[in-house]
């Protein structure tokens, strides 16, 4: 009976762990969709800000700047096999995690999964030369870390400064 009880406890712990992992994955997807909606002006500014605030994300800033990171390995436009699509999604998730970690640590904005296995970054701050340099430095850090960990290259596109959500590109 004691062995049976231990087995049940172990199964319960495994279910809780799986539930927690599923929740984390879903939270990232929900967060990314909300950020993508803000960047793409899908909802009004107020709707986006309220949705993001409910997720614990504050986007109030003097200026914004968007960057997109694209894995070079998968961006040549050729048809991807199911296996390559899965690999691409996994590498994109690694890129997202690296980006999210660095951008959060630098307190420069937020990262999100932008679809098509791309990762977006919404940089928030004051339009200064120092912040401009910090953004470029962060992009290089992400590029270098991905190269170091996965031996992968990325292309980076950085948009222009925007004072409002409508100006984001």
Give residue ranges: language-model regions.
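Interdomain helical linkers/hinges and coiled-coil/dimerization scaffolds
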Residues: 2-137, 162-164
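Catalytic core regions of nucleotide second-messenger enzymes
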Residues: 110-116, 144-156
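Cyclic nucleotide signaling catalytic output domains
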Residues: 141, 156-163, 169
